[in-house]
Amino acid sequence: MKPHFVAGLIFMLSVGSASEADMCEKTLTLGTSNADLTLTLPGTEKSTKCTRSLVLSGGSQVHCGWAFTYRAPEATVAFERLVSTVADCLGTEASMTADQDVNHPDFYDLQTFQSKGREIGVSLKDKAGLSETYVFLRIAVSD
């Protein structure tokens, strides 16, 4: 994945309030350096540190995660907004697939986007043991 694509995606995710616009400037190098960066979830005031990790098969991924109260409706709204934003950013050439259901008491929803060899995942996960629900953004980065 080209570094400018990641920066462009982050810009698209951040358009909105002034604080989100400020956040965009901080994330222009997301995926192009090993530095952890802070990203604000679109439509919310929730910020998190995004981190880069290595993938066993090669390359790396940038992960961002936002915690909500367990099964909070706001988490579902934020997840749907993030899915919509990523879809709009990637355009009609992107394909989106939903992950299969899991046999587990916690809720899980993953939407994976593929476009021109790029992969972006947006997920919503209930963690009963932690009494929290998470929205995750994962961007595959080829090194």
PLM regions: where:
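N-terminal leader/targeting segments
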Residues: G8, S17-H63, T76-F79
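Sec-dependent N-terminal signal peptides
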Residues: H4-S14
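Short, solvent-exposed secondary-structure boundary motifs
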Residues: A35-S47, D101-P105, D109-G117
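Short, exposed beta-strand-loop hairpins at the edges of beta-sheets
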Residues: T112-S115, E119-E132
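Long, charged/polar, surface-exposed segments that mediate recognition or autoinhibition
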Residues: S47-Y108
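Short, low-complexity, Pro/Ser/Thr/Gly-rich segments in the mature regions of secreted, periplasmic
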Residues: G129-D143
